């Protein structure tokens, strides 16, 4: 078996080997996650070509309305208001 000799890391110990594997795995996941979030950014381009690139189309925001319906539940006993 290949033996690695480092003064500060002894990979022949099971705990240190697990630690190094976990550290490398977490580093890989962190770095690959950073590239994925860069690709997932929303480009703020208008859907209307007359307005141009990187401009918010205000018509979209004016058409989006949030409606909150009143609750159908009754108030409990003893509650006022």
Curated annotation (Swiss-Prot):
A motif (SCOOP motif) lies at residues 65-79. It is found in: Cell membrane; Secreted, Extracellular space, Apoplast. One of its GO terms (cellular component) is plasma membrane. A motif (SxS motif essential for MIK2 binding) lies at residues 71-73. One of its GO terms (molecular function) is LRR domain binding. Residues 1-40 form the signal peptide. Keywords: Apoplast, Cell membrane, Cleavage on pair of basic residues, Membrane, Secreted, Signal. Its main location: membrane. The keyword Cell inner membrane does not apply. Interacts with MIK2 (via extracellular leucine-rich repeat domain); this interaction triggers the formation of complex between MIK2 and the BAK1/SERK3 and SERK4 coreceptors, and subsequent BAK1 activation by phosphorylation. Brassicaceae-specific phytocytokine (plant endogenous peptide released into the apoplast) perceived by MIK2 in a BAK1/SERK3 and SERK4 coreceptors-dependent manner, that modulates various physiological and antimicrobial processes including growth prevention and reactive oxygen species (ROS) response regulation. Belongs to the serine rich endogenous peptide (SCOOP) phytocytokine family. This is Serine rich endogenous peptide 21. The lineage of its organism: Eukaryota, Viridiplantae, Streptophyta, Embryophyta, Tracheophyta.
